[in-house]
Design a protein with these regions (language model features):
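Short beta-strand segments enriched in small/hydrophobic residues
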Residues: 21, 26-30, 66-81, 182, ...
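N-terminal helix-turn-helix DNA-binding module of bacterial transcription factors
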Residues: 1-71
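Flexible loop/hinge segments that line or gate small-molecule binding clefts
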Residues: 111, 134-181, 198, 259, ...
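Amphipathic helical "hinge" segments at domain boundaries
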Residues: 5, 42, 46, 55-130, ...
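Short acidic capping loops at alpha-helix termini that bridge into adjacent secondary structure
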Residues: 189-190, 222-224, 274-280
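Hinge/beta->alpha junction and helix N-cap segments in small-molecule ligand-binding domains
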Residues: 78-88, 107-115, 168-178, 194-240, ...
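Flexible loop/turn connectors
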Residues: 168, 242-350
């Protein structure tokens, strides 16, 4: 009786099974699977091909890759997959992977530091050829241990001063300064930076610092404040919004990312506040819904797809053996002006 193709309840066929079915040696089967057809006769190739079809054999690409030292797999860890920023960056990485012939494995750490560590260990054990990371705030020594082990690594949207690896992201200082200058030009005197806890996350601290520098340079009569909020604490957000709305100065809220912008916009609507009549509103990222909310919300658009694509290009260059000092590619942000930052004169006239 001839063997039948493997089913889910049977052991998957192996190279040994193929060799036995084709009545050839395992070396010949390995050569066939590796594309070394010149070393096999046409009759031998046909027998192996027929045996593979009969048994339903599928080669273990992971095992073959490990044996050759190449898995063609890239690991990626994102801080928050529910953030549109992360999704668009991931699309850029994936598009570049397809062009370069790599497969992408994505892990979502869900803003949990311990989960981030576990995923990095998991991907390393899977023998990925390189890692793209958008870290929550993992200590540099943890990332250094990966880099020092010889695994190529690219960091997105974070700056690690003492880590010798490539980094790709937004020019946060340029983008925050551009946004703050716009708010001041529109007549806003008090700029309130609403952000998730800054901690050791360089992108958040750089945005805050740039905002404060621009406001300080504007001179007396202008002020800047920072409100750090846990996304899950809706009561704290509502309280912060009430205090901001009571300001005697013409005020604007500068939301630190897309998720914060959404929460702030919803919170203002619940309080019956209008933008820009009662308060100005501007946010990092430019989500699709921003153009539809009220008079439209002004935002800083990031080239997120390009950031992801560039990160993978850097990584593949390292995988291919390029040797150079650590590189940093910072993309400029683009100001998208809408009604939420309308000048006081324009608001009064309407």
């Amino acid at each position: 009786m001839r063997p039948t193709p493997s089913t889910d309840t049977q052991r998957p066929p192996t190279i040994t099974d193929v060799a036995r079915e084709a009545k050839v040696g395992k070396t010949s089967v390995s050569r066939y699977l590796n594309g070394e057809f010149d070393s096999l006769s046409e009759a031998l190739r046909l027998r192996i091909q027929q045996a593979i079809g009969t048994l339903g054999f599928r080669p273990n690409q992971m095992a073959r890759g490990l044996k050759r030292g190449r898995t063609r797999m890239i690991g990626m860890v994102v801080a928050d997959i529910s953030n549109p920023y992360s999704v668009e960056v991931m699309r850029g990485v994936e598009a570049a992977c397809q062009k370069q012939g790599f497969m992408l494995m994505v892990c979502n750490s869900d803003n949990q530091l311990e989960l981030e560590r576990r995923y990095l260990d998991l991907l390393t054990n899977y023998r990925v050829e390189g890692l793209v990371i958008n870290p929550i705030g993992l200590p540099e020594e943890d990332l250094a241990s990966i880099s020092n082990a010889g695994l190529p690594l690219v960091i997105i949207d974070r700056r690690a001063v003492h880590l010798q690896c490539d980094m790709v992201g937004l020019d946060n200082r340029q983008a925050a300064a551009l946004a703050t200058q716009h708010l001041l030009q529109q007549g806003f005197q008090a700029i309130h930076f609403f952000t998730e806890p800054i901690g050791q996350i360089s992108s958040r601290s750089e945005r805050e610092q740039a905002l404060r520098q621009v406001v300080a340079a504007a001179g007396k009569g202008y002020s800047a404040s920072t409100v750090e909020l846990d996304m899950a604490d809706s009561a704290a957000l509502a309280d912060a919004l009430r205090k901001t709305l009571k300001s005697k100065k013409r005020s604007a809220i500068f939301a630190g990312n897309g998720r914060m912008l959404l929460n702030v916009a919803l919170g203002l609507q619940q309080l019956g506040a209008r933008w820009p009549e009662d308060i100005g509103l501007l946010g990092f990222d430019d989500p699709n819904w921003a153009a539809l909310a009220g008079s439209g919300i002004t935002g800083i658009r990031q080239p997120t797809f390009d950031i992801g694509h560039a990160a993978l290009d850097f990584l593949v260059q390292r995988i291919d053996g390029i040797v150079s000092p650590a590189r940093m590619q910072a993309f400029p942000g683009e100001l998208i002006v809408r009604g939420s930052t309308g000048a006081l004169k324009n608001v009064t006239e309407t």
